[in-house]
From Swiss-Prot:
The active site is at 154 (proton acceptor). It comes from Arabidopsis thaliana (Mouse-ear cress). It is an enzyme of class 2 (transferase). SUPFAM superfamilies: Protein kinase-like (PK-like) (SSF56112). GO terms for biological process: cell division. Its main location: nucleus. Residues 31-282 form the Protein kinase domain. The modification Phosphothreonine is found at residue 185. This is Serine/threonine-protein kinase Aurora-1. One of its GO terms (cellular component) is microtubule. Phosphorylates specifically 'Ser-10' of histone H3 in vitro and colocalizes with phosphorylated histone H3 during mitosis. Associates with cytoskeletal structures that are necessary for cytokinesis and with the microtubule spindle. Also colocalizes with gamma-tubulin and function in microtubule organizing centers (MTOCs). In contrast with the mammalian B-type Aurora, AUR1 has no kinase activity toward 'Ser-28' of histone H3. GO terms for molecular function: ATP binding; histone H3S10 kinase activity; protein serine kinase activity; protein serine/threonine kinase activity. Interacts with TPX2. It catalyses: L-seryl-[protein] + ATP = O-phospho-L-seryl-[protein] + ADP + H(+); L-threonyl-[protein] + ATP = O-phospho-L-threonyl-[protein] + ADP + H(+).
């Protein structure tokens, strides 16, 4: 399939920025800083332009003192190490990083249409066509990650951005691991945790299949499937896979079938990601371009 000229231009810009990042040591004076794009627990994200190339990026500014207080320096180093080596259209690029006495700066790809979470809040829930397009895009990105021995472990709406063309981008690799074996640590977001992580037993890449199933449900219904008033009830519902499909909104049997095949307690029995892409609901609803056009 031919790539549009605009996409080629964007990819060349991204490639140039990445090559430049690898060749030099950045400082804040290399950038014109623009409007704030968002704020997080450890700092802020700004729109920025690299002066020499005129390339527009998102500059994530993190305060060292806050990272140290929360003991997440190791997590940040891991995020930088993993994300800087990933090259996929549905994964936000990390071009490089630099630091000064007080702050750490991450030079990130700019996703012009912003946070998916805000879109979901505004719409309440997505159409099956939109949900399927996003789920298929994420499945392809996760297949790529798993092929590189990277497990994300924290797929959720808050960690997804939308690019200028409407393509989905995985944006946060703070909980991801580069692994060749099974792990036992608990991480990620409660509503999205699979049974094996709730029960603190070994887990592998199939945790991302579970999280993608939760995400698909939330796209279609507007809430995660095991949500409850008390944490203990959420834990119980996850472990028992207490999966219920409300009567409203009306969702196709095919969509429910896909979700049911992903949200399986025995991790080895979850629908593999390559099979997900062949599922009738994905085939019939997902835009093959991976781009949802509003």
């Amino acid at each position: 399939m031919a790539i549009p000229t605009e996409t080629q231009h964007q990819e060349k810009e991204a490639s140039d920025a990445s090559a430049a990042a690898a060749q030099k040591r950045w400082t804040l004076s290399d950038f014109d800083i623009g409007k704030p794009l968002g704020r997080g627990k450890f700092g802020h994200v700004y729109l920025a332009r690299e002066k020499r190339s005129n390339h527009v990026v998102a500059l994530k500014v993190l305060f060292k003192s806050q990272l140290q207080q929360s003991q997440v320096e190791h997590q940040l180093r891991r995020e930088v190490e993993i994300q800087s080596h990933l090259r996929h259209p549905n994964i936000l690029r990390l071009y490089g990083y630099f630091y000064d006495q007080k702050r750490v700066y991450l030079i990130l790809e700019y996703a012009a249409r912003g946070e998916l979470y805000k879109d979901l809040q505004k719409c309440k829930y997505f159409s099956e066509r939109r949900a399927a397009t996003y789920v298929a895009s994420l499945a392809r990105a996760l297949i790529y990650c798993h092929g590189k021995h990277v497990i994300h472990r924290d797929i959720k709406p808050e960690n997804l951005l939308i690019g200028a063309q409407g393509e989905l981008k995985i944006a946060d690799f703070g909980w991801s691991v580069h692994t060749f074996n099974r792990r036992r640590t608990m991480c990620g977001t409660l509503d999205y945790l699979p049974p094996e992580m709730v029960e603190s037993v070994e887990h592998d890449a199939s945790v991302d299949i579970w999280s993608l199933g939760i995400l698909c449900y939330e796209f279609l219904y507007g809430v995660p499937p095991f949500e409850a008033m008390e944490h203990s009830d959420t834990y119980r519902r996850i472990v028992q896979v207490d999966l219920k499909f409300p009567p409203k909104p009306i969702i196709s049997a095919s969509a429910k079938d896909l979700i049911s095949q992903m949200l399986v307690k025995e991790s080895s029995q979850r629908l593999p990601l390559h099979k997900l892409l062949e599922h009738p609901w994905i085939v019939q609803n997902a835009d093959p371009s991976g781009i949802y056009r509003v």
